[in-house]
Amino acid sequence: MGKLFRWSNLCYNDEGLLGMRGVDMKTEHQMPEFMRNHYTLKALEVLQKKKATLFFKRLFDICLSLMLLVLLSPVFLVLSICIKLEDGGPIFYRQQRITTYGRVFRIFKFRTMVMNADKMGPLVTQDNDSRITKIGRKIRSFRLDEVPQLINVLIGDMSFVGTRPEVQKYVDAYSEEMMVTLLLPAGITSKSSIEFRNESDKISKWMDQGLTADEAYIQKILPEKMQYNIDYIEEVSVAQDIKVMLQTVFAVLK
C-alpha cells in the first residue's frame, strides 16, 4: 500500500513532471466559475467515484507514452528531416490549446502546413487546403502529425483518449453541457475523432451552403462531436481507452 500511495502522490501532484495534471478532481468551490453549472457538478460526482480508474488511466498514459516515444524515435527523426528539408521551417507546430479546467497548454504536432498558416486562413483545415505542404499531406494521410502529442501525454497535458483539445475560440462557444468535457484531460483520440475522421468533408458541404469554415464547425460539427465526448465521462476506463485506441488504428489503416 505504501508504494501505491507514493505513486498516487506522484500522479496527483501538479508540480511533478509526470504528475496527474488536470485529473486531481476539484471540489465545486475550486472549479473555475465559467465551468460551474448543473451539468459539470453532476459529472464531477460521477468522476469522484472513479478516482482509482483515473489513477490507473494516468499510469497507463505514462508507461505507454514513454515506451512509444522510444520505439518511434526513428520515425521522429525521419519526419523531422523531411519537414526541415522541404522549406527550412520549424519541425513542430506549437499552438495554444485548452485542457482540464480551462488550463492553456501548447500542443506538439509535426508541422504539415506552411509557416504562419494560422494567419492565412481559418483555424479548421480542409483536405484541399492550399496551406498544406507536400510532405504535410502525406503525414496527415496517416495522422502522423499527431505523434508528437506523446510528449503532451507524458508530461500530463493530455491523455491518449479524451476530448480533442480546442483553441480558446471554440471553447468560448461551448454550451454549459459541453463544459463537462473540461473535467478530464484533452486526448489524442476519442470516439468522436473516429466518427468525424472525415470532418473536413462535412465542413466543405456546409460551406457549399453558405457557411464559413468556422461557422460550420461551431454550429454544425462541434455539437455532434461533443455528445460523444460527454458520454465518455460516464464510461471512462482503461479498458475503454484501449478499445478506442485500437479502433483508431483500424480507422487510420482503412
Label each residue range with its predicted role.
Residues 28-36, 93-131, 192-224:
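Short, glycine-rich, amphipathic interfacial segments at transmembrane boundaries or analogous
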Residues 2, 16-22:
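Residue-identity detector for glycine
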Residues 3, 9-13:
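Short, positively charged and aromatic/hydrophobic N-terminal segments
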Residues 23-26, 183-254:
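C-terminal terminal-structure detector
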Residues 65, 80, 93, 133-137, ...:
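Positions in alpha-helical segments
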Residues 12, 27-28, 32-117, 232-254:
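A hydrophobic, helix-centered structural microdomain
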Residues 126-192, 245:
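A short, structured surface patch at a secondary-structure boundary
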Residues 22-30, 160:
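Short intracellular "coupling" helices and adjacent cytoplasmic loop segments at the cytosolic face
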